[in-house]
Amino acid sequence: NFTFHVWWHRALFSLEKERYDEVLTLYDTQFRATQTEEYLDMTNAIAMLWRLENRGIDVGNRWEELADLSEPRTQGHLLYFADAHFIMALARGGRTEAIQEMLTSLRQAAQRDDTQCQVIARVGLTLAEAIVSFHEGHFDAAFERLLPARYDVIAIGGSHAQRDLFSLVLTEAA
């Protein structure tokens, strides 16, 4: 729902102004008020929660719903941009088994030759491994994986504002 995405952008402005209560209100009442399974709505929510938590903001139990919705999506790989966010939700939701399933599936997909699998081989698997390393507190490993891949992240799609999340992970890992 593109309306929800516009509200997500509005929340980014509030985030930059450090109005965290406002961000959470927009999350709950606007761009995640309807808990859809549509990938754009999910990626908006996942990216915002990740940004908030990395600023030390308690997001309560909001990860649970997103991890629940991400868990059955460890195999499809229709759009790597979404996969990168799903693995974030799985990590923050503590879904260790699903993370391993997704990493295994991504490794297998990287061997195939369709467009999304080429993206996975070029940057996606590295990005997923870096996200997991970061979440586990292995910041040096996350940094070492992300640094050489930083200019290839554009291949996953999304806007500059959406892909900026991965630059933030790199910066925070450093």
Where do the language-model regions lie?
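Internal metal/ion-chelating core segments
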Residues: 1-17
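Helix-coil-helix junctions within alpha-helical repeat/solenoid scaffolds
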Residues: 12-174
